[in-house]
Amino acid sequence: MPRQATSRLVVGEGEGSQGASGPAATMLRSLLLHSLRLCAQTASCLVLFPRFLGTAFMLWLLDFLCIRKHFLGRRRRGQPEPEVELNSEGEEVPPDDPPICVSDDNRLCTLASLKAVWHGQKLDFFKQAHEGGPAPNSEVVLPDGFQSQHILDYAQGNRPLVLNFGSCTUPPFMARMSAFQRLVTKYQRDVDFLIIYIEEAHPSDGWVTTDSPYIIPQHRSLEDRVSAARVLQQGAPGCALVLDTMANSSSSAYGAYFERLYVIQSGTIMYQGGRGPDGYQVSELRTWLERYDEQLHGARPRRV
C-alpha cells in the first residue's frame, strides 16, 4: 500500500509539471515573436534613416529663401511645357500638374514636419501594395452611416478602378482635383473612380502650412473625418468617396500618405503613382488611361 501511494504521488507531480510547461511555452513563443518584430522594425529603421536624414537636410536647406526660390524655380524651368488644352467653350484648361508653390512664410524643417515625413516614409516602406502585385483589400468606411466596406467592393469585373488618396489640407492634392475631375468625366464610361479620404497632411495642430486651402485639425474620431470629407465632396461631385479607418488601414496598406494614385484591375495593381507631393502626378494617370482607352476601343471591330 505505501508503494502504491508513492507511485500515485509521482504521477501527480509529473502531470503538474506538464501543465505548468504549457503557459511557459506560450509565453516563450510570444516573447520570441515580439523580439523578431522588434528586430525587423529596428532593421527597417536603419534602412530608412539615411533617406530620412537626406530629406531632413533638404527641408533645412529650403528654409533659406534664396535656396528655396532657386530650387523651385529651377524645377519649373526643367519641366516640359504642357500642351495647351481647350474645353468645349474654347477656354484654356489648367495643366494637370500645376507647380508646387511654397509661400515664403512657411517653415519646412520643424519637429512637426519631420514627424510627418518619417511617418510617410515608414508607411511607404511597409506598404503591402506594389505594382504588378495583388491589391490589398483594406477596410474603408462610408460617410453616411459609417458602414464598413472594402476597397475591392468598388471594383466591377474587369473595369479598372482608380484610387485617389488625399485630404483637404494637402495643397497639391487640392490643386490637382480639377484635373482629376476632368479624367473622371472623360473616362467614367469604362473606368471606376474612388476617392479615399485619409488623415490630414497639414492639420492645424500639426505640420501647419499657409498654402493649405482649409484649416482642419487632426481627426480624433470618424465624425471629424466625415466633416472634413464633406468639404472635399462638395468640390468633387460625381465621384465615389469613402473614408479611411481611424487605424489608417488603407493608407498603411497602400503607403498613401500624403497623397497617392493607384489603378487596380482584376485584383492586380496596374499602376502605382509616386508618393506625394512630388510623386503625385495626375498627368501620369492620364497617360495610363489614354493607353487603356486605345487598347480597349482599338480592339473592337469597326462597323463598315
Curated annotation (Swiss-Prot):
Tissues/organs with expression: Expressed in placenta and several fetal tissues.
Catalytic activity from the UniProt record: 3,3',5'-triiodo-L-thyronine + iodide + A + H(+) = L-thyroxine + AH2; 3,3'-diiodo-L-thyronine + iodide + A + H(+) = 3,3',5-triiodo-L-thyronine + AH2; 3-iodo-L-thyronine + iodide + A + H(+) = 3,5-diiodo-L-thyronine + AH2; L-thyronine + iodide + A + H(+) = 3-iodo-L-thyronine + AH2
Region (Disordered): 1-23, 78-99
Extracellular side: 68-304
GO molecular function, one term: thyroxine 5-deiodinase activity
Pfam families: T4_deiodinase
Membrane topology qualifier: Single-pass type II membrane protein
Main localization of the protein described in the UniProt heading: membrane
Compositionally biased tracts (Acidic residues): 82-95
Keyword Transmembrane helix part of the UniProt annotation: yes
Quaternary context: Monomer. Homodimer. May undergo minor heretodimerization with DIO1 and DIO2.
Role, per record: Plays a crucial role in the metabolism of thyroid hormones (TH) and has specific roles in TH activation and inactivation by deiodination. Catalyzes the deiodination of L-thyroxine (T4) to 3,3',5'-triiodothyronine (rT3), 3,5,3'-triiodothyronine (T3) to 3,3'-diiodothyronine (3,3'-T2), 3,5-diiodothyronine (3,5-T2) to 3-monoiodothyronine (3-T1), rT3 to 3',5'-diiodothyronine (3',5'-T2) and 3,3'-T2 to 3'-monoiodothyronine (3'-T1) via inner-ring deiodination (IRD). Catalyzes the deiodination of 3-T1 to L-thyronine (T0) via outer-ring deiodination (ORD).
Family (UniProt): Belongs to the iodothyronine deiodinase family.
Protein name per the record: Thyroxine 5-deiodinase
